[in-house]
């Protein structure tokens, strides 16, 4: 559109790509609310001040769509993939009482959660507005969420009627939050929703609130009392592709690139493609990249809502980086057909002990290594293997939580932080090979034939993750043989 305007066209001469029937000058009619939140990565920059200023500090962003501001805000909070399942009520509300007023007043990525906690503690709206300079309207909307939390906590599981569940869902509460507030498990809340028939509706982003027919399949899921779903039945078998979520240090457009090419390849094979993502900065979230696009958080609940609506013949979890891979096991347990690499094969590659056994069986050499769940176990490994050590959590891609430690003090610091990165899986420690050459080899194999796509040589020292480093193609240290 910008190109057409620049060469002299006027808005009334340009068609609206979304509807295909109205001109671009037609005033949009919006029946949804959009919330965007920046994604920060201060954990990658130790010692950097988290206070937000006019300097750009975000590394990515997320976007969510809902029928209400409250719903869109809570969906955006869980889209960030920073363990929050909404605006609090997820078991992460532990704040330093001595400096709490400063936490509320100071602009940081976490301040919105401190504001919600202040309302839980009974702070007046006016006091929060004075401290933060946030418009009272937004404080009132957060107050609505906090009031609903109190109601859910007071009613317990006995108070979870169909009406109250729907009311909570209209405010964006996830099953995890409702479970936390009522003392139940997430799967119990999900089962209760199924019994009551509390399910999200498929809605379309069409710029005209359904007044005109839309040519695009740009969707979001929302809970609306008494409204109709805009879901369309499939003409061909559908495949769901789970994309990567927000950009972060070590993971960016490369995984989105894989998802886009997967959509193209599947379309060429006669499938309808369904993309799920919450990152507005990507090609996968262009409305014309896939047959159907869902702007939804990449959590188990939200992904299952899409799958329940679309009923795909398969779901691809291996092209979107760590986030969809983390969902693979639960999706399989829920009976979802996984296409491509199966969850057990993913576990074989991610579980360091299982992978070491496989390497031993295949007589493939690898640096001395072991796993540890506690600092004492890590010290024992260090004594056996020796420093320096390359340490990283299990079940983590893209270099998150990876470090090189040269002594016991650094090891103790790492182990204290690693439990926050991956609390359910042990830390993997292996001998760090100094002055070694590191290569990235991309290959595709089917058990019979193997195709090597590229061999890249790292310019940085061995151990620097490929997402944080520069590479050279072709490799300059290898012979032609």
Q: Residue spans of the language-model regions?
A:
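ATP-dependent carboxylate/acyl-activation modules
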Residues: 1-481
């Amino acid at each position: 559109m910008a190109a057409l305007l620049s060469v002299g066209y006027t808005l009334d001469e340009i068609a609206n790509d979304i509807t295909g029937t109205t001109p671009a000058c037609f005033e949009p009619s919006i029946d949804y609310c959009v919330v965007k939140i920046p994604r920060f990565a201060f954990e990658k920059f130790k010692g950097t001040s988290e206070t937000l200023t006019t300097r750009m500090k975000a590394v990515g962003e997320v976007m969510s769509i809902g029928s209400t501001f409250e719903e869109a805000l809570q969906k955006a909070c869980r889209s960030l993939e920073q363990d929050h399942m909404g605006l609090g009520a997820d078991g992460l509300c532990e704040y330093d009482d001595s400096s709490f007023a400063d936490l509320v007043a100071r602009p940081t990525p976490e301040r919105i959660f401190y504001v919600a906690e202040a309302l839980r503690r009974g702070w007046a709206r006016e006091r929060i507005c004075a401290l933060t300079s946030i418009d009272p309207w937004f404080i009132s909307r957060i107050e609505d969420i906090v009031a609903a939390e109190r109601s859910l906590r007071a009613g317990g599981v006995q108070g979870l009627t169909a009406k109250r569940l729907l009311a909570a869902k209209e405010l964006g509460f996830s099953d995890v939050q409702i479970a936390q507030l009522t003392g139940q498990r997430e799967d119990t809340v999900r089962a209760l929703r199924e019994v009551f028939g509390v399910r999200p509706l498929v809605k379309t982003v069409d710029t005209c609130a359904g007044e005109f027919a839309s040519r695009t399949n740009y969707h979001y899921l929302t809970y609306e009392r008494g409204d109709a779903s805009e879901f369309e039945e499939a003409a061909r078998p559908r495949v769901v592709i789970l994309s990567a979520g927000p950009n972060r240090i070590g993971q960016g457009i490369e995984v989105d690139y894989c998802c886009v090419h997967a959509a193209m390849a599947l379309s060429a094979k006669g499938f309808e493609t369904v993309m799920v993502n919450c990152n507005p900065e990507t090609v996968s979230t262009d409305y014309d990249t896939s047959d159907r696009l869902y702007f939804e958080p990449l959590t188990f609940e939200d992904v299952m809502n899409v799958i329940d609506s679309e009923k795909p013949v398969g779901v691809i979890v291996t092209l979107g980086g760590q986030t969809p891979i983390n969902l693979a096991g639960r999706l399989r347990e829920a009976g979802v057909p996984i296409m491509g690499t199966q969850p057990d094969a993913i576990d074989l590659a991610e579980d360091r002990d299982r992978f070491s056994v496989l390497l031993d069986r295949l007589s493939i050499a690898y640096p001395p290594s072991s796993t540890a769940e506690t600092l004492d176990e890590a010290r024992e490994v260090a004594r056996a293997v020796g420093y320096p050590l390359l340490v990283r959590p299990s079940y983590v891609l893209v270099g998150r939580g990876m470090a090189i430690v040269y002594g016991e003090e650094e090891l103790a610091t790492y182990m204290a932080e690693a439990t926050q990165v991956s609390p359910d899986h042990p830390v993997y420690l292996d001998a760090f090979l100094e002055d070694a050459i590191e290569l990235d080899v991309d290959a595709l194999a089917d058990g019979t034939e193997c195709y090597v796509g590229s061999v890249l040589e790292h310019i940085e020292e061995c151990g620097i993750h490929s997402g944080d480093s520069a590479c050279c193609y072709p490799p300059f240290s290898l012979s032609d043989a």
